[in-house]
Structure formats: C-alpha cells, structure tokens
Amino acid sequence: MMFKQYLQVTKPGIIFGNLISVIGGFLLASKGSIDYPLFIYTLVGVSLVVASGCVFNNYIDRDIDRKMERTKNRVLVKGLISPAVSLVYATLLGIAGFMLLWFGANPLACWLGVMGFVVYVGVYSLYMKRHSVYGTLIGSLSGAAPSVIGYCAVTGEFDSGAAILLAIFSLWQMPHSYAIAIFRFKDYQAANIPVLPVVKGISVAKNHITLYIIAFAVATLMLSLGGYAGYKYLVVAAAVSVWWLGMALRGYKVADDRIWARKLFGFSIIAITALSVMMSVDFMVPDSHTLLAAVW
C-alpha cells in the first residue's frame, strides 16, 4: 500500500507523458543508430528528475490542492505521506536523476534537466502559478525540457534541432494547459489560481489557443524544413495541426465550453504522441541544401 502512495505522489501519468517526448527527441537525434545503454540512462534519469519535480510540486501545492475537486484526494492532502518525508523523497529522486544524466548521458543533458527542474519547481510552482497569468507560459519551458534532453543526450550540443524541439513542445503546452483550465474552470477559480481563462475569460483564452496552435503548426514544420525529419513526418505534422486548429476554431460556436475543452485536451495528447512517434521513425540527416540551413 505504501508503494502505491509513493508512486502516486510522483504523478506517474506525467512521467509517462514526458517519456514519450524524451523518446521522440532521443530517436530523432539517433537517426537509426541507437546507443541502448545511453537510451536507458536517459529515460531513467529524466523519469527520476520529473518524479522529483512532481513530488516537490505536490508538497508546494498541498494547500491549494485541498480546494480543488480534482486534487483533494492526493496523497499529501490526505496525510498518507508526511510533508517532511516527501521532501526527503523528492530530494533523493532528484539527486539520483541528475547523477544518471550527468554520468550516464552527458553534462549538457544534466544541465538541461536542472534548468527544467528549477523553472518548474522554483519559478512556476513556488511563485508564478499562484501570482501570474503568465505562469502557464513559464511552465511550458519546463514541459518542453524532456524532449530537448533526449535529443541532446545523443548530440551533446544544443543545435537548431534542439531549438526547434524546444519551440514545438513549449508551444504545444499552451493550448493543452488552457484546455485543462477551461474544463476545470471552477477548480482553478476556487483555488484562486490566476490562469488565463479565469483572469481574462474563456473567450480570450480561445483566441490564445488558436494563435498558439498556429505557432505550433509552424514550429512542427521546421523539423522537415531544417532537414531533421522526412516527408512522412511532415504529412502527419500538417494533418495533426490542421485538425487541432479546426477543433480550436469550432470552439467559438460550441454550446458547452467544458465538453469542447476536454476534447481539445484529449486531441492534444494524440497530437504530441503522433509527432513524437513520427520524428522517431522518419528522421533525416540535415545538410547544407535544406531551406533552414540556407537561411541560417
């Protein structure tokens, strides 16, 4: 029973979601030549760091979690694990994860993990989430870190491919997160969390969602234009983006915003999974003949 509680406090669903993006970034950079020990070290290292961040987040948010229907039964809220024990647990997970990334992957992968962790725990969870409508924007940077870590674990450098991944996954986070805030509107309102739909209204949030999906669509195409991914990826990326944008535009005419937002959220997961799979299998080696190479 205790094992289940220690697992739950790490938010395994979030860990799994991040692993999909780590794998996408790693296999994109590997280009068919997979270093399996490096692959395992990277996956486990990122999983431990994400788990650590989630436990710290649970510790920090335990007061507002009590006010939200979705989170009122979390382990720390119910007192199934003490706050002091959770801090020790989170610290140990983080140390193990960072060590694995440093020694098993490379220092760059580790430092990217540190930056993502600091943004999520130190900037987003401790301050921005409670005090700023821009909390989601800041948090999106940490959400994009796993894909970039996976990529840089292979390359050992932050190149244009890593920058494109950072853009794709950061931009994806925004409509994904705003959709959650819309269908969980009352929860966020009750906890006084200043997310965009609560502060500016759902209509404004819909405008932002549409704009971010357009920006996301452009970013996804950059992988192919830069010569990092092939035409199969390009077709899937375009199809996913157009469909997601269509869903967003239909939001202006729906009768029930909550049902629409839940569907938009659900498709966001399908979208990022499809892109991660396609960049894993339809990779390319960039050369000087690509459009982006010519521009840059």
UniProtKB/Swiss-Prot annotation:
Function: Converts heme B (protoheme IX) to heme O by substitution of the vinyl group on carbon 2 of heme B porphyrin ring with a hydroxyethyl farnesyl side group.
Membrane topology term: Multi-pass membrane protein
Stretches assigned to the Cytoplasmic side: 1-9, 57-78, 127-197, 248-268
Lineage, top ranks: Bacteria, Pseudomonadati, Pseudomonadota, Gammaproteobacteria, Enterobacterales
Gene name of the encoded protein: cyoE
Protein name: Protoheme IX farnesyltransferase
Keyword Membrane (UniProt): yes
A GO biological process held by the record: heme O biosynthetic process
More info: Carbon 2 of the heme B porphyrin ring is defined according to the Fischer nomenclature.
Pathway: Porphyrin-containing compound metabolism; heme O biosynthesis; heme O from protoheme: step 1/1
Protein localization: Cell inner membrane
